[in-house]
Amino acid sequence: MLGVLLVLHGSKIPEWKDVGIKYAEYLSRYFNLVEFGFLEFNKPTLSEALSNLLAKGANKIVVVPLLFATGTHFKRDIPRLLGIDGDEKKIQYMGKEIEIIIADPLGFDEKIGEVLVKRVNETYNKNY
């Protein structure tokens, strides 16, 4: 069964968790098993979120980093926190082999660009 794991950076500001909750709720319309976890500062951690998916029966996990570009978090921290060694895409969980695939960062996307235009216009109209 497919599990989706959203990865957020995390912040000392508690409201960051609301973003994870909203994106998880949105993706739950399309996928049965969706969890989110943070790289730092907030809970659930990536490890906790992964454990939740596995406990619910996921045996294939697509990890979706809510990051704009590749960097240390993408290349080193996410795999390490998920227990992935090197180029391996599998972990062991309670005697079972679990496949984990990490999606590319968001990068450039015109739909995200449209959101940025909307934010600029909203902010401008609110303040001028």
From Swiss-Prot:
GO-annotated molecular function: cobalt ion binding; sirohydrochlorin cobaltochelatase activity
Self-association state and partner proteins as the record states: Homotetramer; dimer of dimers.
Functional description taken from the UniProt entry: Catalyzes the insertion of Co(2+) into sirohydrochlorin as part of the anaerobic pathway to cobalamin biosynthesis.
Catalytic reaction(s) noted: Co-sirohydrochlorin + 2 H(+) = sirohydrochlorin + Co(2+)
Phylogenetic lineage: Archaea, Thermoproteota, Thermoprotei, Sulfolobales, Sulfolobaceae
Enzyme type, top EC level: lyase
GO biological processes: anaerobic cobalamin biosynthetic process
Active site (record annotation): 9
Binding site for substrate: 43, 68-73
Organism: Saccharolobus islandicus (strain L.S.2.15 / Lassen #1) (Sulfolobus islandicus)
Name this polypeptide is given: Sirohydrochlorin cobaltochelatase
UniProt similarity note: Belongs to the CbiX family. CbiXS subfamily.
Record has Lyase as a keyword: yes
Pathway annotation from the record: Cofactor biosynthesis; adenosylcobalamin biosynthesis; cob(II)yrinate a,c-diamide from sirohydrochlorin (anaerobic route): step 1/10
